[in-house]
């Protein structure tokens, strides 16, 4: 059941135990201030991340794309080192950091680039950069890739 922001009076009383995800959508500066308040109120009881500049997510601790990919690879008998992932937002951070080949999109949030400076940046999503990269990788796996 959706809860509207004006119904949350005390962020310390957020119903974290029965919630799988809370999204706050709005102005990025407002959400950044809210993120600080939520960190102060919730501490390590929740995972906070931006999935877009205008969307702040509150998730259970340990609930992220990296953790999901870990479960999937274990189920399939694969290694994370053999996986490739592409991302553009802070909700991709754990996933990109856990795989053997992580790639940051050209349109990625600056915070993601700053937190994972060792990962290569490929082209913009609007130019189908993932498709271009994968085509290059499949056709010429040993040649370096140059976006766009």
UniProtKB/Swiss-Prot annotation:
Q: What class of enzyme is it?
A: hydrolase
GO: which molecular function terms?
magnesium ion binding; phosphatase activity
The domain of life is: Bacteria
Which residues does the record give as Mg(2+) binding sites? 88
| SUPFAM superfamilies the UniProt entry points to | HAD-like
Give the matching InterPro entries: HAD-like_sf, HAD-SF_hydro_IIB, HAD_sf
What PROSITE patterns does UniProt report for this protein, alphabetically?
A: COF_2 (PS01229)
For this UniProt record, the keywords arranged alphabetically read as follows:
Hydrolase, Magnesium, Metal-binding
Instruction: Name the cofactor(s) required for activity, per the record.
Output: Mg(2+)
The EC number(s) given in the record are 3.6.1.-
Keyword Magnesium tagged: yes
**Function per UniProt:** Catalyzes the hydrolysis of 4-amino-2-methyl-5-hydroxymethylpyrimidine pyrophosphate (HMP-PP) to 4-amino-2-methyl-5-hydroxymethylpyrimidine phosphate (HMP-P).
Query: What's the family?
Result: Belongs to the HAD-like hydrolase superfamily. Cof family.
Q: State the protein's name.
A: Putative HMP-PP phosphatase
The organism encoding this protein is Shigella dysenteriae serotype 1 (strain Sd197)
